[in-house]
Amino acid sequence: MYTIQQNKNILEVKNQENSVFGKIYLDQGASLQELSLDGNTIIQDLHPLEYKNTYASSILFPFANRIKDGAYTFNNENFQLEINQKEENNAIHGFINDKTFKTIRKEANKNSAVIVLEYIDKKIKVGFPYTYSMLIEYTFTQTSLKLKVNIKNTNTKPFPFTIGWHP
């Protein structure tokens, strides 16, 4: 039987019979920081390395990787993002890696565990003048992890985005 336990900003998924374990940090962008499936370690805790320096297993949105000089053009309009990788003059990995997600749904039974998390951003950011909401759904089974991400544009204008998942 799967169980889901929450302790402050950490969700743990367990199934002793199937050797499944997962640990999600709500206050680190809903990142999956540990994962074992069928007794095999897939994602290992990187302690003593700090999450803020590694972005380990973080969901990357609205852009993955680096935007050189933080500059991009969309619909013939130029935008300037804040530079958060100063030594290389890049905007890096988007905006949600340090945001706190809210638990919307938790379901656990003998075959799987499902967790749905939500983050709503109503603040306009430098270089990204759009609002959005994000749903992240993790489904754990004995031999698989399924990750679904749903982005809803809550603005009146279309916006560019990509989604990535940091190793």
Segment roles from a protein language model:
Residues 1-150, 154-163, 167:
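Surface-exposed acidic/polar loop and edge beta-strand patches at domain peripheries
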